[in-house]
Structure formats: C-alpha cells, structure tokens
C-alpha cells in the first residue's frame, strides 16, 4: 500500500495593506493526522459553522494578532481576533495528539494552547528555533514556500507582541484542491473548444484524410524502393553493345539530374575482377549524402583503379576507335564508355598521368628529369616531405651524383688498392673537382645542403659517436658484401672522401679535433705505400688525419705489415 502524501495548504497574506504574498505550508498528516486535518479544514472552510462560536470555521479574513520579533507570529482567532476565541472542527477543544516533532527552526507551525489538551484553532509560526516549547505544544507543519514573507512579518513585530502594521489573511485553502480545480477548468475548456471546432462528421473526415495521407506515403515509399532497386542493381552484360548502351544511359541520367542546378548525385562503384563489365552500385544517396560522396576515397578508388585499369582499356578501345584525339581526351572518353560514376580527382589524375607507381603522394624529383616509369615504390619518397632526417635512397643518390667519365667507365675508388695519379684528387680536395660536379643544377640550395648533410646519417653517427668505430675489422674481411653493395649503387664515394667532403663543407667540430692525433703518435708508413698513396696532407686540412690513419698499434686489429692502409669503406 502506497504511502499517502502529506497535504499542502496556502495562506495569502497582506502586510500593512501591501499586495498579497503567499505562504505554502506542508501538514505532517503522517505524524499528527488529527491536528493536521483540523488545520486543513480550517484553511478550506469545508467544516461549515462552529457550534460554540456560531461563526464559519475558516481562517479567511482573520489576522495575526500577536507578532513578537525573534520569536513567533500567532493567529487563527477567527471569532474574536485577539487570542481569546476560536474553535476546532471537532467542536470546542481537543487533546494533544503527540510531541514527536520538535520546534527546531524557522517556519515550524505549532498549536497554541492555554494548557495541556486545550487545542482549538489558534496556531503560531516560529521565526527561529525554540527548544523550550518541545513537549508543551504539538508541532503539525512547516513552511515550504514563502519564507521571505515570514521574515517580513517578523519586521513588523514588537516586544509586547502588538504588530506595527496589520498582518491579515486575505485567502487560504489547500493547494491540491486548487490544482485539481484548475485542471478541471482546463479540461472543460478543451472539451468545449474541441466540440466547437469538430463535429462528428468533421472527425470522420479528418480520419479519412489521415488514412489517405498514410496510403499515399506508403505508395511513394514503394515507388522509391522500386526505382532505387532497379537503378542500383542493374548490371551490364558482357557484350560491347550492352556496355555502350549503358554508358549512354548513365551519361544521360547524370546530365538530367544536374540540369536543375542542384548537387549532382554521385554513386561510388565497385568492379569485380572476374567479369568484365559487371558493377554494383551502392544506390542513391540523399541530398545530404551527396557532398561526402564527392570526397575522394583513397581506399575504394585505389582498389577500383588497380583492378579495373586493364579492363578499362579493353572496353574503351571500341568506344574511341573512330575519334582521333590526344591522350587526355582518350582517357576522358574511356571514363564515359565504362560508365564510371565515381568522378573523384584521384581517378582522373591517375588516368591522365598513367603513373604505374601505387604511391599517390607527390614524389620528390632530385635533379633528374628522365626518371624511369618503373620505379620501385619503396625507393620513391612517398610523402615528399623535406625533413632533415629523411634518408635519400640509393637510386636517387646515384642518379644525382653520377657524372660521366671521359672513357665511359664508371669512376669507382676501391679500397686503397690500385691508386694512380688519376684518382689523386680524392685525397687533395675537400669538395668534388669541377669534372666531378653534378651535371644538372639542384632545384634549390637548401635541397643540396640537406642531401649533403643527410646523405649517410647512419655511417656518420656511427663513426663520430661510437667509440667502437676505431676498432673496425680489416677492410679485406668486409670487402665482399661491401663490394656487392657498391655494385648496386655505383655512385657511392669512398668513406674517407666523404669524410673530407663533410670536413671541408662544415665548421670543424671539437669532436674531430679531439680525435686527431699529434704528429709524433703517427705510425711510420712504408715507402711502397707512400708511392702508391701519394701526398697524404694538404695545407687546407690543417694537419688532421683520418681516423683510419690515426689508429694506434695497440688498438688496431690488423697485422703490422698492413698497419698504414687507408680503409675507404662505405
């Protein structure tokens, strides 16, 4: 059984003739039901006329005759108006119900009496907590709305209890009754309005109209489904005549749909590899979906292009036999002949440029105009960024730094063996000689500097940072794999040559200075090696030696006879 909600009553109070302000009070009928019911009936006036007083049992028109500042405001004497009258709905006085509730704060309502079991109609509202009244007066309610009105009532109070301005109850009642009455009035007004507007015939007409509207909506939905299914799942046959007719119909459909100036509806298509002309369309999209379909989808379009490039050429040859146009027009006609409705910029760019590399990012061309179309996608710089940490690939480096020799034989400096005066420039110069300069100019200076700086970052960081670089194994053991690697990219210059190139083009770092050995620690070189290697020093280098020359015998793993060999390893 659900618990019954406590009733709420209201008092419309006017202080000193001011406009009416409302106080809403909750009655604790769950704790003191008899006392709460007495107050509720006195607010509504439903009990009629009192037996002893002969006056209506109603608070309406009565006043708060006693208001003491900081204590309470007392009222409810509807018969005399001075605290000597009043009557309960039970006739005369009634006994104290219980004292379970305390006078614990402002806004608490309690019954006024002249001793035990003398409860009538008079009550008081506390302005603050009054614990000394507990056990003497029965608490039955509390103010839930209008505490500002209670504070205003306190302002007109005095110490003797006579208010400076009259505080009168203009109206009172139960809030649930008012809400129910208002709801009933609203329902009555609605029913009158509906009876005025709609007769029984009008109601039937309206129902018939709604039925017709529903049927027409269903028909329209069916038509849409039929049209979209027939349009989206139509597939072309394998014959050339069918593909040509469908290409014509698709182009006419697109022109008609775009003639009204609205957005053209795109359809993303997918080609199956097994059958030549078969396509499945994803169906019509609404106006809101037309814009996202315009955006090039990299995944779907790349799959479509890679699987349908050969089929497009087969089907397109028949459509453009009689027309002689350039390559761009041929590819445009090829698009129309295979009824491609996905006209993303990626598809047009791929067919116009006919690049066979799957990488779609811009490829950085480093000074070489005639690149082979069969570039490996691994060696293309796919993202085209110019980050200083990006490694140039072997093939691009080889293309840019290769220079033709006078005899047509590629210039390769081997590992210190077979030196002649022809290759002495590699030991004499910091930078390449004019005959070894690149044949083509760089696109910009920053590009050249970035390439020089980042040409071999792994080798540079290893030789400069790691202390294990001084203890490398002899070049004779590592020559077969290194030789094979140089056979693939013939443009790599020797390690010592690159180190001199870096030292000449950059400022001298303290790291190189700390590594360079003094002349007295240098090991003596045999006369045979001196004649083969030529002059080892240049005034420009400032007396610095390469790390391979400055190895001490205790650290060098090579035998004493080969101690002075220079290693030109990559």
Swiss-Prot record:
<keyword id="KW-0597">Phosphoprotein</keyword>
<dbReference type="InterPro" id="IPR020892">
    <property type="entry name" value="Cyclophilin-type_PPIase_CS"/>
</dbReference>
<feature type="compositionally biased region" description="Basic and acidic residues">
    <location>
        <begin position="437"/>
        <end position="467"/>
    </location>
</feature>
<dbReference type="GO" id="GO:0006457">
    <property type="term" value="P:protein folding"/>
</dbReference>
<comment type="function">
    <text>PPIases accelerate the folding of proteins. It catalyzes the cis-trans isomerization of proline imidic peptide bonds in oligopeptides. May be implicated in the folding, transport, and assembly of proteins. Probably involved in early steps of spliceosomal assembly.</text>
</comment>
<keyword id="KW-0413">Isomerase</keyword>
<keyword id="KW-0697">Rotamase</keyword>
<dbReference type="GO" id="GO:0003755">
    <property type="term" value="F:peptidyl-prolyl cis-trans isomerase activity"/>
</dbReference>
<comment type="similarity">
    <text>Belongs to the cyclophilin-type PPIase family.</text>
</comment>
<feature type="compositionally biased region" description="Basic and acidic residues">
    <location>
        <begin position="387"/>
        <end position="397"/>
    </location>
</feature>
<feature type="compositionally biased region" description="Basic residues">
    <location>
        <begin position="340"/>
        <end position="351"/>
    </location>
</feature>
<dbReference type="GO" id="GO:0008380">
    <property type="term" value="P:RNA splicing"/>
</dbReference>
<feature type="compositionally biased region" description="Basic residues">
    <location>
        <begin position="468"/>
        <end position="490"/>
    </location>
</feature>
<comment type="subunit">
    <text>Interacts with SNRNP35, RNU1, SCL28, SCL30, SR30 and SR34. The binding to SR34 is phosphorylation-dependent.</text>
</comment>
<feature type="compositionally biased region" description="Basic and acidic residues">
    <location>
        <begin position="203"/>
        <end position="219"/>
    </location>
</feature>
<feature type="compositionally biased region" description="Basic and acidic residues">
    <location>
        <begin position="323"/>
        <end position="339"/>
    </location>
</feature>
<feature type="region of interest" description="Disordered">
    <location>
        <begin position="180"/>
        <end position="570"/>
    </location>
</feature>
<protein>
    <recommendedName>
        <fullName>Peptidyl-prolyl cis-trans isomerase CYP63</fullName>
        <ecNumber>5.2.1.8</ecNumber>
    </recommendedName>
</protein>
<feature type="compositionally biased region" description="Basic residues">
    <location>
        <begin position="262"/>
        <end position="292"/>
    </location>
</feature>
<dbReference type="InterPro" id="IPR029000">
    <property type="entry name" value="Cyclophilin-like_dom_sf"/>
</dbReference>
<feature type="domain" description="PPIase cyclophilin-type">
    <location>
        <begin position="10"/>
        <end position="174"/>
    </location>
</feature>
<dbReference type="InterPro" id="IPR002130">
    <property type="entry name" value="Cyclophilin-type_PPIase_dom"/>
</dbReference>
<keyword id="KW-0539">Nucleus</keyword>
<feature type="compositionally biased region" description="Low complexity">
    <location>
        <begin position="297"/>
        <end position="309"/>
    </location>
</feature>
<feature type="compositionally biased region" description="Low complexity">
    <location>
        <begin position="229"/>
        <end position="238"/>
    </location>
</feature>
<feature type="compositionally biased region" description="Low complexity">
    <location>
        <begin position="352"/>
        <end position="365"/>
    </location>
</feature>
<feature type="modified residue" description="Phosphoserine">
    <location>
        <position position="340"/>
    </location>
</feature>
<feature type="compositionally biased region" description="Basic residues">
    <location>
        <begin position="509"/>
        <end position="523"/>
    </location>
</feature>
<dbReference type="Pfam" id="PF00160">
    <property type="entry name" value="Pro_isomerase"/>
</dbReference>
<dbReference type="GO" id="GO:0016607">
    <property type="term" value="C:nuclear speck"/>
</dbReference>
<feature type="compositionally biased region" description="Low complexity">
    <location>
        <begin position="246"/>
        <end position="259"/>
    </location>
</feature>
<feature type="compositionally biased region" description="Basic and acidic residues">
    <location>
        <begin position="495"/>
        <end position="505"/>
    </location>
</feature>
<feature type="compositionally biased region" description="Low complexity">
    <location>
        <begin position="546"/>
        <end position="555"/>
    </location>
</feature>
């Amino acid at each position: 059984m659900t618990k019954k909600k406590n009733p709420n009553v209201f008092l419309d109070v006017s202080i000193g003739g001011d406009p009416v302000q409302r106080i809403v009070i909750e009655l604790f009928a769950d704790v003191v039901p008899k006392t709460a019911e007495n107050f509720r009936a006195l607010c509504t006036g439903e009990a009629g006329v009192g037996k002893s007083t002969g006056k209506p049992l109603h608070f309406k028109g009565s006043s708060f005759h006693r208001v003491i500042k900081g204590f309470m405001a007392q009222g409810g004497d509807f018969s005399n108006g001075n605290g000597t009258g009043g009557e309960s709905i039970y006739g005369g006085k009634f006994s104290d119900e219980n004292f379970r509730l305390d006078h614990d704060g402002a806004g608490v309502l309690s019954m006024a009496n002249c001793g035990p079991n003398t409860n009538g109609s008079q009550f008081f509202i506390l302005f603050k907590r009054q614990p000394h009244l507990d056990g003497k007066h029965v608490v039955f309610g509390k103010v839930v709305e209008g505490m500002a009105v209670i504070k205003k009532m306190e302002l007109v109070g005095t110490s003797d209890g006579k208010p400076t301005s009259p505080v009168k109850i203009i109206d009172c009642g139960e809030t649930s009754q008012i809400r129910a009455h208002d709801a009933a009035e609203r329902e009555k007004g609605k029913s009158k309005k509906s009876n005025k507007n709609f007769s029984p015939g009008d109601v039937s007409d309206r129902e018939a109209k709604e039925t017709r509207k529903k049927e027409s909506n269903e028909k329209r939905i069916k038509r849409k489904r039929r049209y979209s299914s027939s349009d989206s799942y139509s597939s072309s046959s394998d014959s050339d005549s069918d593909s040509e007719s469908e290409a014509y119909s698709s182009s006419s459909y697109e022109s008609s749909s775009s003639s009204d100036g609205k957005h053209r509806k795109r359809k993303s298509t997918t080609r199956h590899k097994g059958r030549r002309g078969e396509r499945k369309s994803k169906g019509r999209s609404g106006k809101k979906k037309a814009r996202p379909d315009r955006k090039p989808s990299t995944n779907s379009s790349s799959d479509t292009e890679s699987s349908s490039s050969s089929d497009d050429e087969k089907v397109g040859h028949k459509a453009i036999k009689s027309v002689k146009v350039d390559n761009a027009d041929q590819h445009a006609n090829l698009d129309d002949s295979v009824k491609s409705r996905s006209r993303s910029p990626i598809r047009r760019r791929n067919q116009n440029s006919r690049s066979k590399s799957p990488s779609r990012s811009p490829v950085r061309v480093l000074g070489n105009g005639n690149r082979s179309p069969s570039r490996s996608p691994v060696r293309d710089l796919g993202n085209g960024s110019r980050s200083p940490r990006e490694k140039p690939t072997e093939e691009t480096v080889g293309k840019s730094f290769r220079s033709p020799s006078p005899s047509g034989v590629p210039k390769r400096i081997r590992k210190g063996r077979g030196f002649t005066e022809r290759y002495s420039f590699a030991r004499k110069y910091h930078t390449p000689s004019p005959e070894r300069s690149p044949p083509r100019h760089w696109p910009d200076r920053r590009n050249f500097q970035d390439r020089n700086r980042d040409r071999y970052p792994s080798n540079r960081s290893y030789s400069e940072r790691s202390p294990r670089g001084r203890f490398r194994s002899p070049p004779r053991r590592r020559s077969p794999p290194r030789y094979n690697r140089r056979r693939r990219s013939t443009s790599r210059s020797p390690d010592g040559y690159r180190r001199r190139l870096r030292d000449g083009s950059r400022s001298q770092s303290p790291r190189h200075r700390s590594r360079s050995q003094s002349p007295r620690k240098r090991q003596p070189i045999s006369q045979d090696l001196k004649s083969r290697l030529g002059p080892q020093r240049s005034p420009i280098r400032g007396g610095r030696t390469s790390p391979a020359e400055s190895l001490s015998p205790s650290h060098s793993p090579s035998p004493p006879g080969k101690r002075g060999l220079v290693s030109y390893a990559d």
